[in-house]
Amino acid sequence: MIKKKRWRISTSDKEQENILIRELGVNPIVAKLMVNRHIDVDEGRRFLQGSLSDLLDPFALKDMDVAVSLVQETIEKHKPIVIYGDYDVDGITATSVLYRFLKKLGADVTYYIPERQSEGYGLNLEALELLIEQGTALVITVDCGISSYDIVEAVRDRIDMIITDHHTAPDMIPRAKAVINHKQKNCHYKDKNLSGVGVAFKLCQALWLTKTGEWYLDDLDIVALGTVADVVPLVGENRIIVKAGLEKMNSHPNLGIKKLVDVAGLHERTITSGHIGFTLAPRLNAAGRVTHATRAVELLVTDNADMAEAIAEELNETNRERQELERNIHELARIDVANQGHKADYVTVVAGEDWHPGVIGIVASRLVEEFYKPTLVISIHDGIGKGSCRSIDGFNIYDALKSCEDVLLQFGGHAAAAGFSIDANRIDELRDRLTAYCKEHVTTEEYIPVVAIDAELPVDDIDVDIIDRVSALEPYGMANSTPVFAVMEATVQDIMLMGQLKNHCKVILETSSGTLDAIAWNRPDLFKTIFIGTVVKVAFSLQKNEWQGMVSPQLMIQAIEPLTEEPITLSTEGLRQMYVIVKQAMRGRSQSVYNVEQEILRRKPADQNNRSALTSLDVFKELGIIEEYTSDDGQLMLRWNAIEGKLDLVTSVTFLTYSV
């Protein structure tokens, strides 16, 4: 687990901050946050006051007039239309929005979403041939198709096609009847940040404007869901759409979204972009990863409450399955990393037989969070490995793969994430090649993650009022990230692990008027480095904690470090004392790591500090006295081993490192 981070605090521009304070009447902290985001007065007005009336004319998108005419003609002639979508949340929501809209116009419309494992992303010829055979007159793609020149070319004389997409456009644009993509050449649409569902929504707007002369503003909650999930910049139109969509989600949401919110346990919360990204979107994504994405579309298009509830429950269960798959693969991957020793110093490359390919990307992201190295997770099936890559800041993983392309069967992606396939017997060779590449291209400093901090806050200035003022910048997302603050000196009043698996940490900080709660997700390691009375610096985001009618500020920890660390010193006598304590704490049977650590801190000898006492567990593991394992329910446990005979402390690397 990474403990240290590079703290990078944004510099101040007091002149610009004062201009924003004067012209826009914002709080000084809000002004600083806006300057950090390069927002001037004019942009600030649009940022803070932008509304649905500021949405751009959909006909400014190239080929929109052609697309509208073709859709209208197809509907008037009662010819069948198929929406060809994608299995991620952007594709699911784009399919749902366009389907619901075309149904409203009376269209004969259905949808087709490829199966993730067998068909993969985007258009495939076999599926289009099937649609032609079934008599489809018009295919409208959403969130895909811009790179499918050859496939479109093969069918364009037999079926009409409209491409709507938001991905980077290649030089060779498919020769469909219409191509709507704000990133293609000669498209003068001002906003280049729309998601796939955003582009589909603009098609709906254009059709509705032509039919009624009015803006189409239905289903904005679905559009917001896909926009946030696809991690596009939340500025310009995206910010307006998401802001309005969240308002709808919190007042009169789509039936399927309401049921999804209920099963996720968020029905008493005000839904934010964070809830979409971390709670709702994963449940929709799980369908495409584990089963089939059509179930997620069915949830969003149904008007039957019983059906919506049943599908929401099903997706919730599918998400649990996804989490279990992910947890199991993650644990196997961690064991693989540990067994590799120094081979994993520069790059993480792990592989396993029949690891579910739908979750290896998530596992790769978790391993980056844990070890902060470029990471490749590979699922092997029938001798072929399918890999997913995630990178670290400043390192182009696509270029790294390209340097090894002679080892790979195929690869693709971009700087931050990529995918590839490889013969399983060449994985070790790939690891060696990437290790050499990383040695040359990654500095020691780049292996230390950066926590970017917007501003320092004195601990006594943190209250609910500052949270309310900062909330003017919501919704948060890419290009408008959740503000991160720092307290550079605070004393820990208490620290404890929480959650069923004791894998989250709660730190209580002292203030002049009371205390502040701070939460660190997935950081049980803090219990071994931070103790009651420790003086720390903390980087955090802010949120409200509502409990029994009381509202208080809560710090969500991004990074926390003691200003001075206790030194670790081990002695033969000290370990003898700790052996007695640990043996009594174990009571001859398995115990949770947390319970044993609590007992150690409660009973340790006065001449041993906390870190030294807890480090004794590492010595006992190395000597085989205790063994760490994960229980069936995912909890870290210790097992006591009855060992006969004398043990030699010099066989413990930890003892040799810290002995005095």
Residue map of PLM features:
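Short alpha-helices
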Residues: 174-228
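Generic detector of well-ordered alpha-helical packing
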Residues: 87-91, 144, 166-167, 182, ...
